[in-house]
């Protein structure tokens, strides 16, 4: 067993290998405080025949026992991955994927298992570090290691690896990962911070995780397995020359077409023609031809951009595609918008709900509720393809979370706008940057629904082409530019600052200056888009949709909650059935009444106020005789509140039989004489006009 330790943000970070999971190629136990994550890496020694992509799988899983819990449900065991697990799996995948050598297509699986967790820090950083360490000691070809850190911004200062408590007061939650030389991945949400603060946060995190990289390198030197004797496939030079001569002019013609579907069809025709001419019946040779065509395409697109020629669709490097915006496009929804940017289009719908519609999240750290949900759907027809339709894939979950982060910073507080909010983005067309179209559409749909956002939010995706010292930063990238470029850099925010930033870099050598230029170019693009959005809708509509619930909030004495609920829920059930309103009661006495019909909500409010009203001594009430006894009658003066009208208090004259003066159901006016310590009420009809 080999163990290494390093001080990381004021906490001891420990890496251990050789004690657990010894049959995996690489296994590292990462711990900090009471949080422990076991990360394993296993690779296949042989590539599958015909494999033409790198099959890397990353699975992050949280075990309930890690927090001393037993899973819910009938089977009492962990089920499908939670959203948190899916997002963390993507977080690990993104910075390690570019570090495997080109041409390496053997299957690799990384599994990170949270086996113990405290309530102080998120295990995701430990899982990222563990994945890097497990690969570093495994012998699998990997050009790492990487380090990772979380950065907060509190009271004007950067904080490394903040606790959950610190994050509640932070203006920034940023995760950065990279190698010694370069930043490879950034994921963040922010409270409208400037581009300068965001860039400094990235550089701060990169500097702070360098000791972690050194520790992983020390662990690998001492405990690492011999590196695999893997050699990149040898290129067929003669075939390369033949394919290049034949295909280059055809591919140049294809990339001269600015319309995506026409271009895709032409590229497909070229690929089929080259496969027929050079592929023969050898599957390996066919793979080589496809790989050569991909290289030629990459060279054509990148070369044109670096030479200053127009991009694939005819734009220069800083121009945003044409944008059309419509708000209120669906008649019965609470809010909707159709946002179209070039060949990317999103139909975004906002729905207002009550507290009962909030999402309940059962995490290792405890149960919580989320009043804001954003769901992103990417159907196959959006790219002119067929495919499976069903539960969301990892990509859809990741894009939805990015858009949610972008919008969350401008939402009103629960006290300002007591609604739960669900936004759904249906991507109808896609040619790059559909997640940023979702951000723009979500902002518009929420404002169309009457949500008082602090400011409109827009997003833009940036790209980078870099060859040696030459580089070009691209605004509003297309899908092809994303695939063939060196960086995918999404920035969302308001006129005041950044609310979300996501960056994936595929190469080394991205300098601070390049990132600064990309951020400033993104700001210009964002402001342009916001100007167009503001021309359609610049703030929340003054009124809610006719079909949205109206919410009334009142405060009652917590001791009176039982009066509103009634025995077995009888009273509140009757209230909801008779008024049609939805009623939610918190333990602190906050009552939320929701109803599409405003009058129904007002009626429910009046009845709750009567149910919880205190009976006042010497006050006259209009009551109803509930039950007659030999010694008097019980009179209901408020809902659920009966008082005793003694036979001696019915009249100034002597009463021998109560039935001579009162009948059940009779309306009477009574005065409260006394409310004793047990809450019993004494009433009188004497000297009160009936």
Swiss-Prot record:
GO terms for cellular component: cytosol. Its EC number is 2.7.7.8. GO terms for molecular function: 3'-5'-RNA exonuclease activity; magnesium ion binding; polyribonucleotide nucleotidyltransferase activity; RNA binding. GO terms for biological process: mRNA catabolic process; RNA processing. Its main location: cytoplasm. It is found in: Cytoplasm. It catalyses: RNA(n+1) + phosphate = RNA(n) + a ribonucleoside 5'-diphosphate. Mg(2+) binds at residues 482, 488. NCBIfam families: polynuc_phos (TIGR03591), PRK11824.1 (NF008805). Component of the RNA degradosome, which is a multiprotein complex involved in RNA processing and mRNA degradation. This is Polyribonucleotide nucleotidyltransferase. It comes from Acidithiobacillus ferrooxidans (strain ATCC 23270 / DSM 14882 / CIP 104768 / NCIMB 8455) (Ferrobacillus ferrooxidans (strain ATCC 23270)). The gene is pnp.
